[in-house]
Amino acid sequence: MTSEEFFAAYDAFGERRTGGEGDAASAEWLRARAQAAGAAAMLMPVTFGRFLPDPSWLEAKGRRIEGLPLFDGGTTEEAGISGALGPLGSDAPIGVVEMEPRAASLPGNPFAVARQQSRHAAIVVALRTQPDSLAPLNAHDAESPFGPPVLQVAGREAPFLLGLAERGTAARIVVAGSRAPGRSANIRASLTGEAPPLLLLTPRSSWWTSTAERAGGILAWLTALETLAASPRRRAVVALATCGHELGHIGAHRAFTAEPALARDSRLVLHLGANLGCAGAEHLVVRSNVEGLAERMAAALVAAGHPRAPLEVATGGKANGEAHEIESRGGSYLSLIGDNPWFHAPEDRWPDSVDIARATAIARAVAAVALEQAA
């Protein structure tokens, strides 16, 4: 399968929000791909409390703006909440704010703190991206929701809403949904060898189709697994593709609760994060808490054909994505995370959002470094 065929196949599953039909279908597809690569691959069931959104909106000045509830926030009664709009942090009953979806990429982010300290009865947040459509925030506290009801709306509504907030315009907001048992799965693939293993880690779920956000990491994960299975090596390999990324890394939490040594004691955790090979966004963060390893990865990327200038190479600092789960558990990680103008937006689709040449170069470089670490 060529890189182009891989991205097209990935994109064809459509929306892969955790617990949905696309999530289940793409999980079995990826398990089969890992098995075909030469690994022993299985689905590891993950149960969770699933939030099912109902129609939600804000009405003001004769307009109804449809949106999506924040998945780790509260909901309103059927009649909603009526009151004046005002800037987030004001005394207005309904707070208004604009932000980028990446601003809430880690637990305890400033917006989460603002929600905890909020005096608002409800909040509406306009999410800004290149297409300015509805690009939801990740719900880090999906298993323990808190705070006032929050309505997420398209970024294109920000100027209108902020203007109303400055004038204290009256509005009504409805944020609705229910919670039910949900089911998803991690994929766990393994190659035999000596302990401690090399761990390949990538998230596989997202809010929408999210092709550039997720598929580049999965391509690198599969490419490395295929290379490791076909090459002489000494070390065992475990490859995890986890669900629930957008819901506070639920799949990673379940995996490392079941096998804490994987996060803590693996020879290295190679974290293949978001936006690897996204079109129009060459910036790529290469970060490790192992001295010299980020520089080695950067050299491998350049050797594979990735431009050097956009690489941000760092040792230490704050790990993001699932690498944060490794860092917080005392493990050694090497992490790759890129940028994406369509981040969390429904327009992140093949072929428009994918830079095939860079995605392929990243996958080749990851496979080369993985093979070195498993030698």
Residues covered by each model-derived region:
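His/Asp/Glu-rich mid-to-C-terminal helical/loop segments that flank catalytic regions of hydrolases
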Residues: E226, V237-V238, W342-A375
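Metal-dependent peptidase/peptidase-like ectodomains
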Residues: E194-A195, T242-W342
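Solvent-exposed loop/turn segments at secondary-structure junctions
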Residues: F48-G49, P101-A103, R128-D132, E157-A158, ...
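Structural recognition of the beta-strand scaffold that forms the well-ordered cores
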Residues: L43, G95-V96, A122-A126, R188, ...
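N-terminal capping segment at the start of a domain
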Residues: M1-A24, A37, M44-V46, W57, ...
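Noncatalytic luminal/extracellular "stalk/propeptide" segments of secretory-pathway proteins
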Residues: F7-L106
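Soluble metallo-hydrolase cores and metallopeptidase-like ectodomains found primarily
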Residues: A60-D91, A135-R214, T223-A230, R234-V237
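Second-shell loop/turn segments in exported
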Residues: A12-E21, A40, D72, E100-F111, ...
